[in-house]
Amino acid sequence: MIISRGSHVDEEPVAKKPRISVGEMTDDTTDDGLNTEEIRAPYTTEEMDEPEKAALLPKIPKKSPVSIGMNPENGKYVLPNYSKDESLNARKFLKYYGLRKFLDTYLPEELNSLYIYSLIKLLGFEIRDKELLSSLYRFFHPVKSSDQFKLEYEDFTDPLEKKEAVKLIKDLQKAINRVLATRIRLSNFYTIDHFVSKIKKAERILVLTGAGVSTSLGIPDFRSSEGFYSKIQHLGLDDPQDVFNYDIFMQDPSVFYNIAHMILPPENMYSPLHSFIKMLQDKGKLLRNYTQNIDNLESYAGIDPEKLVQCHGSFATASCVTCHWQIPGEKIFSNIRSMELPLCPYCYQKRREYFPNTGDEEYDTLKGNLESGIQNNNFALKSYGVLKPDITFFGEALPSKFHKTIREDIMKCDLLICIGTSLKVAPVSEIVNMIPAYVPQVLINKDPVKHAEFDIELLGFCDDVATVVAQKCEWDIPHKDWEGKLKKKRFDVNEIERGVFNIEAGSPE
């Protein structure tokens, strides 16, 4: 049994290279309909200088890197041992030259399924099917450094069954799609000095922010052990994220308004990190700030509306879910603090027809009627005339501004800085994989983001890292704490591994 040039299996004596259909088994289309394949950026650009291009270009192998020999003494096969550099080069080759040339270069013309498995390993992956893995290793010879025997590289029969070979082809498809969808770190951008030099020269910086930029103000993040979702587990919801589920809100808005006070943002406050972004704007360097936060603190810091994309909406405004009348968000803050349903004045009389015994202060009665409505399946009544903050719930589309700007911005930016985010929610989390490969990417976060490949990771409190960067750039952050507390504050900066630094406040002199 052999692997044919298509994805099916033939009973012929010689195998040919498989035709892999990239995208057939991929997750590139996000939940919000943003197809990263359609807007994937070029690998290099003519604007790059030669050292920058050289850092991205792969080496062309002198011979087929994937070669499998057989030990004639026991009939078992020997897999090559691939180094990290060989794996990195294979990934670069695939991304730069494309799939067809990659397969032509890395696989011999005649092959069997063991070559497919070896190529998966070369790309840095392992198959998860334990049964298939067990079948494979029955045919491999464990090689020790002291072993000396001559291998045969002539054609040999594929040891795997047809269904196992098909599984391997599908796993190779997944590995290829993952490589194409994930960036590769730049080899010439890995120190803080590199970052400082780049941020000084950059003219179109894309900043992506998450909850970590606001935690210093007492606003909880969402997914950490001390975050918001952990604090509401006592509510007994199947999923803590249900408090932001649009369908559940429409069925029973009290689920959200029982906890909304916990995430209500402070007014007219912002962190040094917010001011750091404002500083980039003032210096003409900020292309756009895409924030996943709903606290609207960027506006308090002075980020211009045209420079700000609130990907998940914000508390800045609130709208009636029935007639869509909109008001400034602070108009319902008192209701939120009192855990009351804010009601639209234009829909109020009609709502009283549905709930005739409900006064403004009779929240318990209203809640009881809402629960009764749920039991009776009268979904149109429960949220009738309720004002909802204009934050994007699960089940709602992202604001149109996100889609209008992101396609242009990812092609324009010359530096990406991700700050205070775990990059867990699509499609915003996909931005890092859509940026051109030659654009440096920097993470500023308390914890590493293991599923992304940043060139430089600055781990610590966001305000501390922003202060260190500003100090090294000899820039002043426009924040009330800068002159008195931050400008001369000392920090300990330790390199954990190449490109990864831990930053902590140092001991006072």
UniProtKB/Swiss-Prot annotation:
Main location: nucleus
Gene3D superfamilies membership: 1.20.120.1710, SIR2/SIRT2 'Small Domain (3.30.1600.10), TPP-binding domain (3.40.50.1220)
Keyword terms of this UniProt record: Metal-binding, NAD, Nucleus, Repressor, Transcription, Transcription regulation, Transferase, Zinc
Active-site residues (renumbered): 312
Record-listed NAD(+) binding positions: 210-229, 292-295, 420-422, 445-447, 462
UniProt GO MF annotations: histone deacetylase activity; histone H4K16 deacetylase activity, NAD-dependent; metal ion binding; NAD+ binding
Role noted for this protein: NAD-dependent deacetylase. Heterochromatin component that silences transcription at silent mating loci, telomeres and the ribosomal DNA, and that also suppresses recombination in the rDNA and extends replicative life span. It acts as a NAD-dependent histone deacetylase, which deacetylates 'Lys-9' and 'Lys-14' of Histone H3 and 'Lys-16' of Histone H4.
Family: Belongs to the sirtuin family. Class I subfamily.
Protein name as catalogued: NAD-dependent histone deacetylase SIR2
Species name: Candida glabrata (strain ATCC 2001 / BCRC 20586 / JCM 3761 / NBRC 0622 / NRRL Y-65 / CBS 138) (Yeast)
